[in-house]
Amino acid sequence: MKTLEEIRKIREEKRRELNIRVDTTVGEKEKHILVCHGTGCTSSKSTQVIENFRRLVKEKKLENVRVIQTGCFGLCAKGPIVIIRPEDTFYAMVKPEDCEEIIQKHIIDGEIVERLLCKDIDGTKVNKLDDLTFYKKQKRIALQNSGKI
């Protein structure tokens, strides 16, 4: 059993991590790479995407970058889905070989990888998951915290 003080310390550490995922103005120096690991994305090689990101983060010694396996984001047809926090950039149909480009261009150079942005129903590229027409009219209940917890 942990002491009350140890539990408080764990709570504060986790609260800081969650703030990066909930409040996009927090943690500009720290990045979280959220990778969907729902069944649809897993069948499209999201496990390899996660492994590649983790390997690259370690190889490049990116101490302020965390790779986080998440549950389903609810748009399986566009998987594997990767979201970079805190800016909430939404990449779709990410292949294992795309990880190097995302790490170099987005994480290190601070540039969006345009070719991996999701296209909306009218063909325009969308930077953020919530800007997709697919999500705009939805009231997400079961998936409201997807990628946050």
Which stretches of residues belong to each language-model region?
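Feature of Fe-S/electron-transfer and energy-metabolism proteins
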Residues: M1-I149
